[in-house]
Amino acid sequence: MYRRVFVGAQLTLLGLLGSLLLGYTLPRAWRILNTDFPNYYLAARLVREGVDPSRAYDWIWLQREKDHRNIDQPVVGLVPITPFSTLVMWPIAGLPPLVAKHAWLVLNLALLFPIVWLMRSVSGLSLLQVGCLVGLCFPLHRNFLYGQYYVVLLGILTAALWAVQRQRNYLAGSLLALGVAVKIFPVILALHFVKKKNWAALIACLVTGLLCAVASISVFGWSLHRTYLLQVLPATLRGEALDPYNLSSSSLSSLLHRLFIFEPQLNAHPALHAPWLFAILHPALELTLLLPALMWIEDRASSATRTALEWSALLLATLTFTPLPASYHFTVLILPVAIICGYLVQERRSAPLMIVIALYLAVGYPGWNTAPVDGWRAFLHVKRLYALILLTTVALSLIRSRARVQQRIWWFAGAAAALTISIVSGLKHQHGLFDDYPYRLPMGQQMFLAAQPIPRGSEIQTIALLRNGYRRTTMGDDTVRFSSADGVNDELSLTVGGSQLWTEVVGARSIIESSFGPSILDAESPATLAGGNELAFLREIDGRKQLFVGGQQLTTPTSGWNLDEISISPNSSIVVAATKNRGESRLYTVRGVDQLELIPVGEARYPAISPDGRWLAFSTFQSGHWNLSLRNFSTLEVRRLTTVGCNQTQPAWLSDSKTLLYSSDCGRAQGFTAICKRRFLP
């Protein structure tokens, strides 16, 4: 009798949860694109259309491409997405955006059925019980609303565990490699293969990972992957791919950033400014969770139940210290929780089972107060982090076992080495990181980033990212004013010449509008010649940006050039940053049509010629960062102005030819720059 009532209650709950998904979440997801799906879709569509995607991690560059395709989403960005993860959108990238999302939603909904079936097998729960756990996962609803990837990842990881339990090691390794290619964090699960000496699975993982990399590079090119490996991935691991001080992520990284790192706009009142504490505590606390999960993995073949528990502990530890998780990340939490619940049901341990379910609901609960607060009060605003830590502790308690002392010594030695390297690397990264804080110009709190500074009289014109898109912004001594544009079209670049202000207004096409005078159609990234009477600009032809001065085209697509930025000297000589055949960006002097003469300063972008014509400021790329450099046109001497572990780009000279404006993301998220004003010459 009790069993029938219990099953009836489960059926009722599943019916209610299914109605919520099908009757509320899916209709909302069906009507609009929402935040994340356009990012994946756009990347796949660009390469499908033959556009060079090398700059896809540049926020403003990608926004322009989004606008040109009439994608109804205020802001897009590819950071911190892996290029490979967008490849699955290739078959549907030829569809209109909302139709493509419909296809994606149908695929995700269909995947839930085999996922539930496989999860029943790996966890020991009934189909009904697994269905209830899936329905109780609020992050799953967010995954559907935003068109995210985590249902696919959940399916991959569940299938990989199913294969491990049945000793189908090559299949398990290959599936895990797919999971890593989609979202980096499952790479920690490969340590399970190492601890078990499951070399077949590890080799399959490495080979499949290599094949995924080859496939991705063949589609997107090496340049985009180089940017990901050298810039995006390191920032992601530090928790700085997006706003690192935002407590809504409820991560260890965001908590420690909030407590110990000062930033003038984003975190003006930390508990104390002690970045060295972040460099030490972040890896140390991560290791505190990860090391037991590794140490207590048995080094011999285990039962299917034991293997599943080991995976759940390792996956939970990984999810707990993921740097900047959004709510939908925890769709993957269904797998480890199902495994733990299945084990506790079999052991008839009701109290721990109730605790696990309560913690599972707490992790997914959308109503936690994560508002920004100052100082030590930040500890009160990361409740999801505490629920994850407790859930991981439960999983660790279930796998605790006695490992041989010799093996423990080796693992401890490896952990100590990894911790030392991480701390030293973190401290090195912080060297000089905050040096340009005294030179920062005040930003409005509504500005997520400010870029492309241009002096105009006593004020500075810049492009700012606001909640509804990009707007030209005027920054005075104590004031910030936004352009009175219609609010529909983005404003993505600008220049000043004489009394004129030229702004690139972007909709289905880019139009350079003058403060007075005619506009220029299909033109972007303007730069004025001396006197401001003639304009140089870029125009996209066959997926690459080409240089125009007035009505004359100075580069052609057949030559392989793809231009990024333009600078013009007082005597009207032109210096550009450009790539050829998807190579590294270099600086060139334009001598004629398709005649670009290399300036030998290494990999460089963002040229800016001083008003007196003596100096060329630019950014050079070294050790994964863009830093400022200076070249004397007379002596040809080149010197580095800055050497820091962040990006300082888009220099612009003041009229004294000694002071630079530039964009800096030091102490901020990758590419989310602020404006600095700094004198470099005596």
Name each model feature, range by range.
Residues 1-171, 196-327:
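Primarily membrane-embedded glycan-assembly and transfer machineries that use lipid-linked glycans
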Residues 106-111, 151-156, 179-185, 206, ...:
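Membrane-embedded alpha-helical segments of multi-pass membrane proteins
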Residues 114-118, 155-166, 192-197, 201, ...:
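Transmembrane alpha-helices and membrane-interface helical segments
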Residues 150-153, 173-176, 223-230, 333, ...:
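A cytosolic-side transmembrane-helix exit/cap motif
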Residues 174-193, 321-332:
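Transmembrane helices and adjacent periplasmic/lumenal helix-loop junctions
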Residues 339-430:
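Aromatic-enriched
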Residues 408-682:
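Sequence signature of WD/YWTD-type beta-propeller architectures
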